[in-house]
Amino acid sequence: DVCDSLVGGRCIHNGCYCERSAPNGNCCDTAGCTVLWWCPGTKFD
């Protein structure tokens, strides 16, 4: 899998959800960690 972003040194993949405290405030949808609104939970390797 290709990593979209790293949090705590862990890969975040397409379709993941990022926390508000994630670097750059990233959240994600199925296109990757790029959406501008917050989503619940996280999905790491």
UniProtKB/Swiss-Prot annotation:
Its main location: secreted. It is found in: Secreted. Disulfide bonds join C3-C16, C11-C28, C18-C33, C27-C39. Expressed by the venom duct. GO terms for molecular function: ion channel regulator activity; toxin activity. Keywords: Bromination, Disulfide bond, Hydroxylation, Ion channel impairing toxin, Neurotoxin, Secreted, Toxin. One of its GO terms (cellular component) is extracellular region. The modification 4-hydroxyproline is found at P23, P40. It comes from the Eukaryota. The modification 6'-bromotryptophan is found at W37, W38. Mu-conotoxins block voltage-gated sodium channels. This toxin reversibly blocks voltage-gated sodium channel in cephalopods, with no alteration in the voltage dependence of sodium conductance or on the kinetics of inactivation. The cysteine framework is XII (C-C-C-C-CC-C-C). This is Mu-conotoxin-like Cal 12.1.2g. It comes from Californiconus californicus. The lineage of its organism: Eukaryota, Metazoa, Spiralia, Lophotrochozoa, Mollusca.
